[in-house]
Design a protein with these regions (language model features):
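N-terminal secretory signal peptides that target proteins for export/translocation
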Residues: 1-18
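C-terminal motif of bacterial Sec signal peptides marking the signal peptidase cleavage site
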Residues: 32-35
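Catalytic-loop region of hydrolases
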Residues: 41-123, 127, 135-141, 147-149, ...
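Cap/lid segment of the alpha/beta-hydrolase catalytic domain
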Residues: 130-206, 252-253, 260, 404-428, ...
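Alpha/beta-hydrolase fold nucleophile elbow
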Residues: 207-218
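Glycine-rich nucleophile elbow surrounding the catalytic serine of serine-hydrolase chemistry
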Residues: 216-226
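A catalytic-pocket lid/entrance helix-loop region that shapes and gates access to the active site
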Residues: 226-228, 233-343, 486, 503-506
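Short beta-strand/loop motif that positions the catalytic acidic residue
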Residues: 448-450
Length: 592
């Protein structure tokens, strides 16, 4: 597989950066479809999931009648439905009618519920929200379930769906000094929206759904794990993609370190050191050194933890006048800092579970590095997404702290930053408690997935969470209800050079409804017309896909399960205690 042309990369990156804080919201609403391809070798196909004995159910009342439904028992006084009308959406080229219900759950949780007028298969899916949320994704747009070209349950309007803005409007956290809005964003908004959707379903169809699912990516992945931890009976199956479960760490130390590493002055007053063109130079060198681990020349790194690439290996010779194909000493230092992450100055202990991994460099553009080339320098680090998400989340993370730190005063080299600034809101905002015993007991199924080339959230945090689950509950118990998939070359909630089209909806429905646990899941690359150009299986962690050695390596049929390439547990780091069991905190109006 050839590398993407640099012009295409930079154009794509500019488009990503243009959406700034809204980027993650877009990613999260795409999750359910990003989980809809066709089944592959050793996997459960979409058609298998469709064989579940669930009859199509038709409405028993007119859509307009739902406008009169009282939802104050769920959201409290002031909760109201504002409209209930039949709308038409284009799904897979066909027109599909939905009873679209809009409303507000007090004090300010705006929601939309989409109920298929025909073809409902007794399934419900709540859709996660990304970034700092603040907008309601249109749940009638089944095409927003990206990559659903072979998932008939989604394409044919088989799911009732719901989405919420989680209690506020806008992508910053200016609202976050309000304790109730903190709670609505942290955990309450999705839960009460689900209860409302279920009430509407029961009224509209004359019966409850048979199966309920939650699908989210990024913050939507955090919301997914929050549901499993706090409301274990809400969903039969949960898909948590690239979860920002460590919300506070992610939006302070993690992204803040990217800014500090990039700055010519070491703080937010400086300009960027590493630019888009040099990120591509770095990426080419990394994949040349570490790509092809699966036995084919595809430029993908099957497990970046085995890649010991040193940026100094491509440092420009002293006195070089043309540095377009090498890194300057300053650029080498910046890249090394981004990979290495911060450490405690006294103990040498790492401050983070992980950083952006080798092979993710192309995806740094617009996040860790500017969208422009080094010839367009200087660009202030305040233009980076990493800076914007950190400063946008100040109020949400540090309200109630002894002082309000800034991106320049975070304890990047002082482990006491965790108990001093992040511990207080940890049980409220984070979703890192590894004890999912109640969810397991309720029969729930969980699929975690993460792209190895994620530019926003290091996959090592997700590995840390999965390992914590195994250490807390026992590996055999975890295997009974949870799987984790790590996808080489795939960026944050999709994209990248890898195989981003992955069918997880059929996997979770088959597991929850038929008891068929997922194993190999086929992933796909497609062209601009959405035609499949290559396929490859991905296996439950820690196994990797390995080319069989015969046939076309672009065909997933010629791949098998390989042994893990890396067998060490996640290193101890300053925030490791955040991944031990704790009692979730609540505040404000209690959720039903």
């Amino acid at each position: 597989m050839s590398h993407l042309h640099s012009k295409r990369i930079f154009a794509s990156a500019r488009a990503r950066a243009a959406s700034l804080l809204g980027l993650l919201a877009v990613c999260a609403t795409a999750t359910l479809v990003a989980a809809c391809g066709s089944g592959g070798s050793g996997s459960t196909s979409s058609s298998d999931a469709a064989k579940a004995p669930l009859a199509v159910v038709t409405p028993v009342v007119d859509c307009s009648k739902l406008a009169a439904i009282d939802i104050t028992d769920i959201g409290g006084a002031g909760s109201t439905i504002t409209s209930a009308t039949v709308t038409t959406a284009t799904v897979n080229g066909a027109s599909v009618n939905f009873c679209t219900v809009k409303g507000t759950l007090a004090p300010s949780n705006t929601f939309e519920v989409a109920l298929p007028v025909s073809g409902w298969t007794q399934r419900f899916a709540a859709l996660g929200c990304g970034g700092l949320c603040g907008n309601v994704s249109d749940p009638t747009q089944q095409s927003s379930f990206s990559f659903s070209y072979t998932c008939p349950l989604v394409q044919q309007g088989g799911f009732a769906t719901a989405a919420t803005d989680m209690g506020h409007s806008g992508n910053d956290a200016s609202w976050a000094t309000d304790p109730q809005k903190q709670a609505d964003f942290a955990y309450r908004g999705q839960h009460i929206t689900t209860l409302t959707a279920e009430k509407l379903i029961k009224t509209y169809y004359g019966q409850a759904q048979k199966y309920a699912y939650f699908v989210g990516c990024s913050d939507g992945g955090r919301e997914a794990l929050m549901a499993a931890q706090r409301y274990p009976n809400d969903y039969n199956g949960i898909i948590a993609g690239a979860p920002a479960a460590h919300f506070q760490i992610q939006n302070s130390l993690y992204h803040g370190w990217s800014v500090k590493s990039q700055s010519t002055t070491g703080d937010s007053t400086g300009n960027a050191v590493l630019y888009a063109d040099k990120a591509l130079v770095l990426h080419k060198a990394v994949v040349a050194a570490c790509g092809g681990q699966a036995g084919v020349p595809d430029g993908l790194i099957a497990d970046p933890r085995t890649c010991n690439f040193d940026p100094a290996s491509i440092q420009c010779p002293q006195g070089a006048t043309n540095t377009s194909s090498c890194l300057t000493a300053a650029e080498v230092a910046t890249a090394s800092k981004i990979y290495g992450g911060p450490v405690d100055a006294t103990t040498g202990e790492r401050m983070l579970a992980g950083s952006p991994q080798p092979g993710s460099e192309e995806n740094w553009v617009g996040v860790e590095v500017p969208t422009t080339n080094s010839t367009d320098a200087p660009v202030p680090v305040t233009k980076l997404f990493s800076y914007m998400i950190v400063t946008g989340a100040y109020n949400l993370i540090f309200t109630g702290s002894p002082t309000m730190p800034t991106i320049d005063t975070f304890g990047y080299t002082d482990a006491s930053f965790y108990p001093t600034y992040l511990q207080a809101n940890h049980p409220l905002m984070d979703a890192t408690s590894p004890d999912l015993s109640a969810f397991h007991k309720a029969g729930g199924k969980l699929i975690l997935w993460h792209g190895w080339a994620d530019q926003h959230i290091s996959p090592l945090f997700t590995i840390q969470y999965f390992e914590a689950m195994q250490n807390t509950m026992g590996a055999s118990n975890v295997s009974d209800f949870a799987r984790m998939y790590l996808v080489p070359g795939v960026g944050h909630c999709g994209g990248g050079e890898g195989f981003p089209n992955i069918d997880l909806v059929s996997q979770i429905t088959a597991w929850a409804e038929q008891g068929t646990a997922p194993n190999a899941v086929m992933t796909y690359q497609t062209d601009s017309s959405n035609n499949v150009t290559a396929s490859r299986p991905v296996y439950p962690y820690p196994a990797v896909a390995q080319f069989s050695g015969t046939g076309d390596w672009h065909s997933g049929a010629n791949w098998t399960q390989g042994s893990p390439l890396y067998n060490e547990p996640t290193h101890t780091w300053a925030g490791s205690s955040f991944y031990t069991s704790y009692s979730p905190a609540t505040q404000g109006v209690a959720a039903p």
